[in-house]
């Protein structure tokens, strides 16, 4: 603690992250599980990215967005898990105020990018299935890059806004965060100044970055389902529903966990449920996305096989 009377600056120099478990025996188990999940996530997502880069058949808009999703998944799990593994190894549970802000910024940057990227992927499927004749012109490489660039810009603005707003709050103790990473709901509960403005910003951001994209995704897929049902070929319907079903599964898991985390700001204390949802958001989702979305795809599997046997090269 570094109290500064008469100023509006924080008095907390570091936070104590209570983590997932407190007993030493369980910490060893958690360390092994997290390390395994991290390695699987990195391996799976980098494999997808490599396949998209080297296989000409995968040089299509859908796979361009999938490659970007893989990069996001690697970033999302890297923001939280390596630091947690380090704390488990060193048996230190503290994180500095600046490191906490940095983790918060990058977490919201990547989560916000996820929102917009999933929306762009829904738009891509809408054009491919409902507007096939104009798909190649309306979803050309320039449009793809513009969608990704706009997504990064909006996500960066959102993350920076929340981070700056958090620096205006006073933290004068206690400094124990009942979580395994720094996030807004848990930090709001520790602030000894009013969090109304920060919470208002969070709800506005939720409307812009969660509700609006979710409505757009729902409307897009309503049109997609109507178009798919008009396909006479059973094989064509199956292929279309398979692609759309994978995307909707990812959307459902991502938005479901996000709503649970950020729509419960009125609760007095963080609970173990918040930690479980946090594990889903930062560990399980990035690990499952390659399996749900890409590794079930025969084209991706074929590209990975060629990469492994040396028929394709990254150079």
UniProtKB/Swiss-Prot annotation:
Residues 1-29, 83-103, 162-199, 265-275 are extracellular. Odorant receptor. It is found in: Cell membrane. One of its GO terms (cellular component) is plasma membrane. GO terms for molecular function: G protein-coupled receptor activity; olfactory receptor activity. Glycans are attached at residue 8. The lineage of its organism: Eukaryota, Metazoa, Chordata, Craniata, Vertebrata. The chain crosses the membrane at residues 30-52, 61-82, 104-123, 144-161, 200-223, 241-264, 276-295. One of its GO terms (biological process) is detection of chemical stimulus involved in sensory perception of smell. It comes from the Eukaryota. Pfam families: 7tm_4. Belongs to the G-protein coupled receptor 1 family. InterPro entries: GPCR_Rhodpsn, GPCR_Rhodpsn_7TM, Olfact_rcpt. Residues 53-60, 124-143, 224-240, 296-315 are cytoplasmic. The keyword Methyltransferase does not apply. Disulfide bonds join 100-192. It comes from Gorilla gorilla gorilla. It is a multi-pass membrane protein. This is Olfactory receptor 3A2. CDD domains: 7tmA_OR3A-like. Keywords: Cell membrane, Disulfide bond, G-protein coupled receptor, Glycoprotein, Membrane, Olfaction, Receptor, Sensory transduction, Transducer, Transmembrane, Transmembrane helix.
């Amino acid at each position: 603690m570094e109290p500064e009377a008469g100023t509006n600056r924080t008095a907390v120099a570091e936070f104590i992250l209570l983590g997932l478990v407190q007993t030493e025996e369980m910490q060893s188990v958690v360390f092994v599980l997290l390390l395994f999940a991290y390695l699987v996530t990195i391996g799976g997502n980098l494999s997808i990215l490599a396949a998209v880069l080297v296989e000409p058949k995968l040089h299509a808009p859908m796979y361009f967005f999938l490659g970007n999703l893989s990069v996001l998944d690697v970033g999302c799990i890297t923001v939280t898990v390596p630091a947690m593994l380090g704390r488990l190894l060193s048996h230190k549970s503290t994180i500095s105020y600046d490191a906490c802000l940095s983790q918060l910024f990058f977490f919201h940057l990547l989560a916000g990018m996820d929102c917009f990227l999933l929306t762009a992927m829904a738009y891509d499927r809408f054009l491919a299935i409902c507007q096939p004749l104009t798909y190649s012109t309306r979803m050309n490489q320039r449009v793809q890059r513009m969608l990704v660039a706009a997504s990064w810009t909006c996500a960066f603005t959102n993350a920076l806004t929340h981070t700056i707003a958090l620096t205006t709050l006073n933290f004068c103790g206690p400094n124990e965060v009942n979580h395994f990473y720094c996030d807004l709901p848990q930090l709001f509960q520790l602030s000894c100044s009013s969090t109304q403005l920060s919470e208002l910003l969070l709800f506005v951001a939720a409307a812009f970055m969660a509700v609006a994209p979710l409505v757009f995704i729902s409307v897009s897929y309503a049109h997609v389902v109507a178009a798919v049902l008009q396909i006479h070929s059973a094989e064509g319907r199956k292929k279309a529903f398979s692609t759309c079903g994978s995307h909707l599964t990812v959307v459902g898991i991502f938005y479901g966990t996000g709503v649970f985390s950020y729509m419960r700001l009125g609760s007095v204390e963080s609970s173990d449920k918040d930690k479980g949802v946090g594990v889903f958001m930062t560990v399980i989702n990035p690990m499952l996305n390659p399996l749900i979305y890409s590794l079930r795809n025969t084209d991706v599997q074929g590209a990975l096989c060629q990469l492994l046997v040396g028929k394709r090269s990254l150079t």
